[in-house]
A protein has these predicted regions:
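Non-catalytic cap/lid and distal C-terminal segments of serine-dependent acyl enzymes
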Residues: 1-140
Length: 140
């Protein structure tokens, strides 16, 4: 792994995909790219999807909320594709809404709607996401 930010790649699904986006958007100088698969990217309240009370207050949660971070940092993500959003299992609506928001904000991103897969690390999505993070897969 490179020490520079472009060598620090984030990959996750479900809440860890949400976390990958949140990390990159909060620390764009530290991380290069983030890929999320079947993630609740538009989660707008603390405690949803099993996140419990880890954020504490609603004000604290606001500092991690992906939709707010996209809006606040759009200008920093318009030139180079650093956000990757692929496939779905149970969060297709969240992906569609995140994609629409990124389009509206003119954020450069890779979006693939599908294929639908089981909400699991072993359902076959990791290879495609890793290839996209590494720039090894052409857009189909």
């Amino acid at each position: 792994m490179k020490a520079a930010s472009e060598g620090r790649l984030l990959l996750g699904f479900s809440k860890s995909g949400w976390g990958a986006y949140s990390l990159l958007l909060r620390h764009p100088d530290l991380f290069g790219k983030a890929a999320a698969w079947d993630a609740p990217l538009m989660m707008d309240k603390s405690g949803r999807y099993g996140s419990g009370d880890i954020f504490g207050t609603d004000d604290n949660f606001a500092g991690y909320r992906v939709s707010k971070l996209l809006e606040d940092n759009a200008a920093n993500f318009q030139k180079e594709t650093r956000l990757i959003l692929t496939g779905y299992g149970g969060f297709r609506d969240e992906h569609e809404r995140a994609h629409e928001l990124m389009e509206k904000l003119k954020i450069a991103h890779e979006y693939r709607d599908g294929p639908a897969r089981k909400h699991d690390w072993h359902s076959g999505w990791v290879k495609e996401a890793a290839e996209l993070l590494l720039g090894r897969k052409d857009k189909e």
